């Protein structure tokens, strides 16, 4: 007999309560206000939007911090095809730097929330939680363009960690693709993602040997790569969960089976480019999860 009942699994597919959702929305609103009311930043073209599990509506009760992207658009970083120069595409440079921008965002948050409430970290600037808001990770980014030979480009975001590492992401494509898959699976994609995330926390709470490489983001991307039929063709969460684990286990036994898997944005490979996780990590985790569930 399985460890959890169908009712338990069903309850874990649901989003946070209304009161938790209100706290999340308060956090996003206050970050917007901090940026728009800042004397220096208010004169620049900046877009503030949610990203990560909050924006994708895949957060679970134990993971109710949020990521807010604060994107600068008066300049952009870019990657060009080989043998092309920025002059070929009419790109002009700006004297304003990413480092200056992150400092300016930090100052705006300190002015809004107070120095004691704001902590600068390697990848983000964290606003501490209180009774009104949840902990909020503010990620200052710039527009980023990945050019093709013909001059067309894919637009994303780029930022530099305080340790000097550049990271590019495609949060808007991630959100759009997640919505599309959710619509094509009777809203089961996001529910199954929440279920996988919740079970990871349950395993950790139970003292399970869960690798730090198995992140909430990775789990969402793994569910993204599960075929829609697994969410659509089975009638219970017990069976959908079971079949998703079987699929992920079978297709991560050999690297060749999953080497083309992408993130939800489908603009970055899931297992390429020096990721902290490997397909072997995922395969081992699926065994651990299966045994935890007592299937």
From Swiss-Prot:
Protein name, UniProt field: Cyclic dipyrimidine nucleotide synthase CdnE
Assembly and binders: Monomer.
Keywords, comma-separated and alphabetical: Antiviral defense, Magnesium, Metal-binding, Nucleotide metabolism, Nucleotide-binding, Nucleotidyltransferase, Transferase
Cofactor binding note of this UniProt entry: Binds 2 Mg(2+) ions per subunit; only 1 is seen in the crystal structures.
GO BP terms, alphabetized: defense response to virus; nucleotide metabolic process
Free-text comment about domains: The (R/Q)xW motif controls pyrimidine nucleotide specificity in the donor pocket, while conserved Asn-169 is important for recognition of uracil in the acceptor pocket.
Annotated Mg(2+) binding sites: 67
A GO molecular-function annotation: nucleotidyltransferase activity
E.C. number: 2.7.7.-
Region annotation (Disordered) ranges: 1-28
Disulfide bonds listed in the record: none
Cofactor list: Mg(2+)
Gene3D superfamilies found in the cross-reference section: Beta Polymerase, domain 2
Residue numbers binding UTP donor: 53, 197, 217
Top-rank taxon: Bacteria
UniProt feature, compositional bias: Polar residues: 7-19
Positions of the record's site feature: Important for uracil base recognition in acceptor pocket: 169
SUPFAM superfamilies hit by this protein: Nucleotidyltransferase
Keyword Mitochondrion in record: no
Record field: catalytic activity: 2 UTP = c-di-UMP + 2 diphosphate; UTP + CTP = cyclic CMP-UMP + 2 diphosphate
